[in-house]
A protein has these predicted regions:
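Short glycine- and acidic-rich boundary segments immediately preceding or forming the N-terminal edge
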Residues: 1-39
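Loop/turn elements at helix/coil->beta-strand transitions in domains of secreted/extracellular proteins
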Residues: 21-24, 37-39, 52-54, 106-111, ...
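Divalent metal-coordination and catalytic microenvironments
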Residues: 36, 60, 112, 149, ...
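Short beta-strand-to-loop junctions in surface cap/lid or active-site-entrance loops
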Residues: 41-50
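Short, solvent-exposed loop/turn and secondary-structure capping segments
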Residues: 52-53, 67-70, 122-128, 160-162, ...
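Short helix-loop-beta-strand segments that form the rim/entrance of peptidase-like active sites
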Residues: 68-124
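Glycine-rich, aromatic-flanked loop segments that form ligand/cofactor-binding clefts
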Residues: 102, 108, 113-151
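Metallocarboxypeptidase
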Residues: 142, 153-369
Length: 386
């Protein structure tokens, strides 16, 4: 088997929707890409999107990272098959019971956005394998092409104004930069706007995971500066801190997060890491996103920031999984990485089935603690091997 191309990803999602009409909905995003492609999201769950909380899973934001779209397509197929056959799932030594699978689909909606950036993936697979961005023409048909979609979201997007000059924030306003051009405006790109549209259209989404590669790590907010839980006034909305935001090794500014939220996201990230490790022993450490380097315009921080910028919006907890050790591993290696992603994301979903807050209410971190998903497996329950 080989990596799925853009058309095969689309066909796979459509085929799953046709095969499991009672537990899926195929959602067409409103904004065509620069090359005219229409992207789709597969909603998985037994209850309407308005009744239960949702988990948004993104893949393929960066074109050269070939594993994440395949991993999300295969996770969707695994969950739907296991649910339909009343079986559990096994990824290496990580097991989930049939009860786990049934509860995930009954108590959550999963929004599988397997390939956010199809133009970029097509270009990468057509002979420019390290291509990262989308395919916007930045200079009227010249050779300055593409926006880094994970620098284009409306979170501290204007890094020149919102970060210290010596912060080292990993983005650029140079439209000819090959890797991290932020775009001409926040959410300028149709691919970015499609993600925003999903969050706007389905306000019960509470969890957001952007799957990337290739440094094995599980990241949580914030990516703008080190976290702190004591001073709410130090936050991304406070322009007074723009001259010092993101500066390394100083205490002039740190990004505020509530203690409950910090406990919650580190606990859930830890759950994902434990499940990944059980697949084949590979370690995905948990880290605050800023620990890699300061960023602006990232999808996970944008998702989490929405509630702070507008308290009427429900809180969405953002994560990034960086999977595997290379952008395009051999297929044999990719299969193991796909199992790791499947294990981590299923563990997250199993954990958050115990967290069903009303819109705008913060779930208790204590609900994340307790027995692992495997402990609910009844003797003799069947498994589907992934």
């Amino acid at each position: 088997m080989a990596y799925l191309n853009v058309d095969e990803i689309t066909s796979a999602l459509q085929n799953l929707a046709a095969a499991y009409p009672a537990t899926t909905e195929l959602i067409t995003c409103p904004h065509p890409t620069h090359e005219g492609r229409q992207t789709q999201v597969l909603r998985i769950g037994t209850r309407p999107a308005s009744e239960v909380d949702g988990v948004l899973l993104l893949g393929g934001v960066h074109a050269r990272e070939w594993v994440p779209p395949d991993a999300l397509v295969l996770l969707a197929a695994d969950l739907l098959e296991a649910h339909g056959k009343s079986k559990g799932l096994r990824y290496g030594e990580q097991r989930f019971s049939a009860t786990d699978v049934q509860e995930i689909l009954a108590r959550l909606n999963l929004f599988v956005f397997a390939c956010v950036n199809p133009d970029g993936r097509r270009h990468s697979q057509a002979g420019d394998p390290l291509w990262r961005k989308n395919r916007r023409q930045n200079n009227g048909g010249g050779d300055c092409v593409g926006v880094d979609l994970n620098r284009n979201f409306d979170f501290l997007w204007d890094h020149l104004a919102r970060f210290a000059a010596d912060s080292g924030v990993r983005t650029t306003a140079d439209p000819c930069d090959k890797f991290t051009y932020r775009g001409p405006a926040a959410a300028s790109e149709p691919e970015t706007r499609n993600v925003v549209w999903v969050l706007d259209t389905y306000p019960r989404i509470r969890w957001h995971v952007d799957v990337h590669s290739a440094v094995p790590v599980i990241l949580h907010s914030w990516g703008s500066d080190r976290n702190q839980t004591l001073d709410p006034g130090q936050n991304f909305l406070a322009s007074a801190f723009d001259p010092v935001r993101g500066r390394p090794n100083d205490n002039a500014y740190r990004e505020y997060i509530t203690e409950d939220d910090l406990d919650l996201v580190t606990g859930l990230a830890g759950r994902m890491g434990e499940a990944v490790r059980a697949v084949r022993g590979d370690d995905y450490p948990v880290e605050q996103a800023y620990g890699l380097y300061p960023t602006s315009g990232a999808s996970d921080d944008y998702a989490y920031s929405r509630h702070f910028a507008n308290p009427a919006q429900g809180k969405v907890y953002g994560f990034t999984i960086e999977c595997g050790h290379s952008f395009q591993p051999t297929w044999a290696e990719a299969e193991d990485v796909i199992r790791e992603v499947g294990a981590g994301l299923t563990a997250l979903c199993a954990a958050v089935t115990r967290l069903s807050p009303e819109p705008g209410q913060v779930p208790s971190p204590a609900a994340v603690s307790g027995t692992s998903p495997t402990s609910r497996r009844a003797p003799g329950e069947a498994e589907t091997l992934a």
